[in-house]
Amino acid sequence: MLSKGRSPRRKQVQTQRKAALVLSVTPMVPVGSVWLAMSSVLSAFMRELPGWFLFFGVFLPVTLLLLLLIAYFRIKLIEVNEELSQNCDRQHNPKDGSSLYQRMKWT
């Protein structure tokens, strides 16, 4: 029996949501049931979540953060490469005024 204002579809959706909640809470459930419960929860989540929020609130900030991290580590890598090349030049080129070079020059 349906009460006034309730359609069979609404009642079916509510029972599916309750079943998904029960399946997601129960610890010893077969894998197929977990997949069914998870898919219904995800579909309900995607129905309620606006697309613009998903794009501007999740996808865009994560993408910008990853690009920022890539740029930061690239800058640090370039700095380290420059320091290593300067140290390597100093070791192979003793004309920088080191005392060992000056001693060898005087003898």
Swiss-Prot record:
It is found in: Membrane. It is a multi-pass membrane protein. Residues 85-107 are annotated as: Disordered. The keyword Hydrolase does not apply. It comes from the Eukaryota. Keywords: Membrane, Transmembrane, Transmembrane helix. The chain crosses the membrane at residues 19-39, 53-73. Disulfide bonds: none annotated. One of its GO terms (cellular component) is membrane. This is Small leucine-rich protein 1. The gene is SMLR1.
